Amino acid sequence: MRAVALSLVALAACLFPAAGLADTAPKPAAETQVPAEHADWTRLLKTYVKASSDGITRVDYAGLAASQKDRSALDAYIERFADADLSAKTDANFAAWANLYNAVTVRHIVERYPVKSIRDGYLTGPWKEVKVQAGGSEVSLDAIEHKIMRKIWGTPEVHYAINCASYSCPNLPAKAWEAATLKQDLDAAARAYINHPRGVTVTSRGLNVSEIYNWFEADFGGSKDKVVAHLLQYAEPELAAKIRANPKIVRYQYDWSLNDAAKLKKTVKP
């Protein structure tokens, strides 16, 4: 990780230690410098994010790749974060970092499209290599997720806010994250994921759950029991009853296939 990225994070972490969302008063000076409006990103999301009957949103990467106008709009949106003050621990900055992460990820896929997975061409993935200017420094996707969002906010909601362009990732929403509705939107995202088979599948042996709950177990309480307790917070009554009947995690699962809208078209019969 570049030293400049770590220095930015170290300063932010010292000033704003990890805790829950919006548990510190917003600082007006920082708020005024943050891109408050995410209308351009919302327009792009509404245009290119496609809902499906299986509950997973897909992205029309081919359509976006073909539109120079919208690719330019995406670039312009991302550039707005270059010199913004994003250090304060506020809902507005959580939304800003999450939106930026998702926008940069979508741009990365579009620039390399067609691909079958975000990991194509990489040993483990592009997250340390894909960088963007934000908050006055160059930061990678890896730094945004692990050194900024997880470190400063320290809440499980981070994992429902960012999208890795993959089938098993929590959905990319069809609108930008906004401070005013952040809590309810993150709650809805968590419920949608946990109540979908890619989040939790109940078997006769126990629970098959997303690898997210393995990779980031510490963020969900630090043990399998705490992970199960987290799942029960969001599980619908029928699923919750099944989880309680056999609350043992027996398998982790993850599908890195690209969340590509083109796959939906192939499943439609003429």
Predicted regions located by residue number:
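Bacterial N-terminal signal peptides
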Residues: 7-16
